[in-house]
Amino acid sequence: MWFPDDPRQTGWERFLDEVAEAGYEWIELGPYGYLPTDPERLADETGKRGLRVSAGTVFTGLHHGPAVWDGTWEHVSRIAALTRATGARHLVVIPSFWRDDKSGAVLEDSVLTADQWRELARQTERLGREVGDRYGLRIVVHPHADTHIDTPENVARFLDATDPDLVSLCLDTGHYAYCGGDSVELIETYGERIGYLHLKQVDPAVLAEVREQRVPFGPAVARGVMCEPPRGVPALEPVLEAAGRLGTELFAIVEQDMYPCPPEQPLPIARRTRAYLRSCGLR
């Protein structure tokens, strides 16, 4: 889900029903306000379906430095509080987009200056410290298409600049492939930084068109660039094997970006994907 309320995506009650029906047990909160924000009601709605929450999600523009801290913390703190109330231990941090995901309008330069990189690292460490101290949560930063933490080079630069004790990575296999990355190589190189997984695939033929035509991420999703496993890349078996060799317990949340999304479309895909992942050894 991309938005708290949008007629072109599945309603929250149907979402919860179908997640459970497809055989999954864990969900993320998604955009704040999509699921109920009252902790007791949220616990009731998830509990009666046998679901649990693994993480909340926040959106940040920390490369802008201290000037955006107060607004960022106001956004983060209420989501962190709800996340803690669910019993989850992780907060997924998505960097701000340099290009609007709907219109494709360029919002700022796609390349950060050296000063902006320093602020991004410094303020993300601050966020990790504050979220950990105040809410007992671990932040996992999510490299994402059309953000400044996207390509293998930018992901490596970000990881090299941040404290492993404060900042981990949410490796989204689809976004990383979309931006030219190899998930297995990243796991093998920065294994100690991988704190969370999003399992996803991209359609290589659609991706080639997207790159050639410089299509923004939102319209690329509408074209079907994110596809149902095992039809796309990366192959998930080697990714899961590499993650297994780390010897740590990781959440692996299954996703397929679909927007706009006909309401009848997700459930059959979710069922087939769950069966496929079981065949890969994922319980």
Q: What does each model-identified segment do?
A:
Residues 29, 33-34, 65-78, 91-101, ...:
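Hydrophobic transmembrane alpha-helix bundles
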Residues 37-38, 63-65, 101-102, 149-150, ...:
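Short secondary-structure boundary/hinge segments and terminal tails
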Residues 27-29, 53-58, 91-93, 139-141, ...:
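Hydrophobic faces of well-ordered beta-strands that scaffold small-molecule active sites
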Residues 1, 30-32, 58-63, 96-98, ...:
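Active-site beta-loop-alpha junctions enriched in small/polar residues
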Residues 26, 64, 108-112, 140, ...:
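Short amphipathic alpha-helical segments at helix-loop
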Residues 1-90, 114, 118, 125-126, ...:
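N-terminal pre-domain/capping segments
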Residues 4-5, 9-23, 47, 87, ...:
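Histidine-acidic metal/acid-base catalytic patches
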Residues 68-169:
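Active-site acidic/histidine proton-transfer and metal-coordination neighborhood
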